[in-house]
Amino acid sequence: MARKMKTMDGNHAAAHASYAYTDVAAIYPITPSSPMAEATDEWATDGRTNIFGHTVQITEMQSAAGAVHGSLAAGALTTTYTASQGLLLMIPNLYKIAGEQLPGVFNVSARALASHALSIFGDHSDIYACRQTGCAMLCESSVQEVMDLTPVAHLASIKGKIPFINFFDGFRTSHEIQKIETWDYEDLKDMADMDAIDAFRKNALNPNHPCQRGSAQNPDIFFQVREACNPYYDALPAIVQEYMDKVNEKIGTDYKLFNYYGAPDAEHVIIAMGSVNDTIEETIDYLVAAGKKVGVVKVRLYRPFVASALVDAIPDTVKQISVLDRTKEPGSLGEPLYLDVVAALKGTKFDQTPIFTGRYGLGSKDTTPAQIVAVYENTTKKQFTIGIVDDVTNLSLELGAPLVTTPEGTVNCKFWGLGADGTVGANKNSIKIIGDNTDMYAQAYFDYDSKKSGGVTMSHLRFGHKPIKSTYLIHKANFVACHNPAYIRKYNMVQELVDGGTFLLNCPWNMEELEQHLPGQVKKFIADHKIKFYTIDGVKLGIETGMGPTRINTILQSAFFKLANIIPEERAIELMKAAAKATYGRKGEDVVKKNWAAIDAGAQNVVEIQVPESWKNGEDEGLEMTHATEGRADVVKFVNTVQAAVNAQEGNNLPVSAFTDYVDGTTPSGSAAYEKRGIAVNVPVWNPDNCIQCNFCSYV
């Protein structure tokens, strides 16, 4: 069955599929799940109908799970979208909803829980905290899988009479944009069991056939009633596989409760769930081509955990198993997935197979192919971590050289921007233009800190003629753009270019000024590696076109399309102008025309820099870092050992020992004085003639 290709992120994929089976959506915003709720709300307002021909009824309230419980009890198919602390607050309701056999679906973009510090980024801490509630749990590894398998959660919940937590990785999947195949609602309707839906509605609390729920039971019968649900959980895996088979039949996939990928005679297999599986698959392709016998088992149905299905998925030739968990449970014998695997394999043909356990990816820590290779090469550390340097408890695995495992022909682009300057938004438009108007696969991911605005943003774009499984950040790029000239001395960005790559710098400098402002190591790298170097004065063009000095995103997007040559320049300009009209049309014709002028200006004002031979003699001047030299000793130590590296985007290189004094999450006050970033376009000057003594300048 041919499906429409669209470019979207994981949140919108989940919302699209879940909307079809939803009568009521109880929503409340929490990062990174909010876009699911926002999309559902927007579609309902626009009058989109579900498979029953109705628009979804939206209710927004703090007690979203309480509203879900009540709505389900009243006979409405109900969905909510949440993550992290928001999901934790739902746990009491999850027990009740599962105990009352109500088929709700909780779509979760899995996120870290606040422990020593808050993290808005992704791991599996939140969903693991719900594994004992009685809810079934289904996991997806990619944006395409979110689209394909979210219907399975809804349909199996209805037929199996058990609520589902349908989850995928926060940010890495929820916010990653991919070109994917999408469901038509007629196909989703075709898979629905209308008899099961009617039975659910007839079982609702209704004055026409009253019953009592929420009673209290005494020791004489509580245990027996609790055990009476066992047949439903025993039957659920077969129901899930039944709907996976229906999906497979429609779209030609091979979804199972556990899917194996790799060498048929693999000797070392990783077991994992979530977005890391795509990185593992890409690494396996690289290793198997080199003769290695490795593979991965991808966990899809985490609850109920079906031991027999796991055993069937593992090749008989396996000599070692490594289980990867994206959480930390201090004091436990191991993390949850590891303990499940150990219990599942006990007494089977893999009873004597060594099972190693590793932690990875906490708080969206990047997981690269080199780290996966380290897991496959590890034969000594039964407990390990990857992605960090643990020089305190020495659990981390040593990494080899970085690997390039992306499919041949994949183009990698990286954009350094300033939070709220429009760079991220422009790149979202760019990837959709590429995805929707070419036959190429496209992927976009956006890396930024927790600041509301003004922080560093890094946009990672990939596109090519083969599917893209690279669920990790770009560190070797064909194209790098720096949208703020202050960054050139603060961050290592040019060094991430491949030989012959393209570097675009937004700056007002001519050749003489470039000689003065570019650090020696940047000049040397550009010259030594034959980098094609271009500049554009986005601020000047922004002022001239009426966009203003800070809204330079459209100008730089146009410059990117000119230099990248993915789409013919005239066609790219035409598509950008159409996107600008669609985005800003409601704000009036004047705003649209300013954007069109900016698009034309960006394409026409790119300046190619002829790199002089003398740049090969450039000396390494190091990065500009603010260090503390006086003041309180605790502040000086923190700024110099931690903050300076973090501000230079080098925090990933800090070892565990750098944080032994901050293990409880506390940091010394007064460190913001050393975080001046020098990013302003203009510097204010006090004018005594205009001063009204408001004292506002004392706050600036």
Regions found by a protein language model. Name each.
Residues 120-170, 194, 350-361, 528-530, ...:
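Conserved thiamine diphosphate
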Residues 282, 670-672, 695-700:
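Iron-sulfur cluster-binding cysteine motifs and their immediate structural context
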Residues 24-57, 250, 264-265, 269-300, ...:
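Anionic-ligand anchoring segments at beta-strand to alpha-helix junctions in alpha/beta enzyme folds, i.e.
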Residues 1-129, 134, 151, 171, 241-389, 460-462, 477-479, 502-553, ...:
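Thiamine diphosphate
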Residues 4-7, 304-309, 317-320, 324-335, ...:
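Active-site cofactor/cluster-binding pocket
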Residues 18, 321, 683-700:
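Cysteine-centered iron-sulfur cluster-binding motifs in ferredoxin-type domains/subunits
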Residues 53, 164-259:
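Conformationally flexible catalytic loops at phosphate/diphosphate-handling active centers
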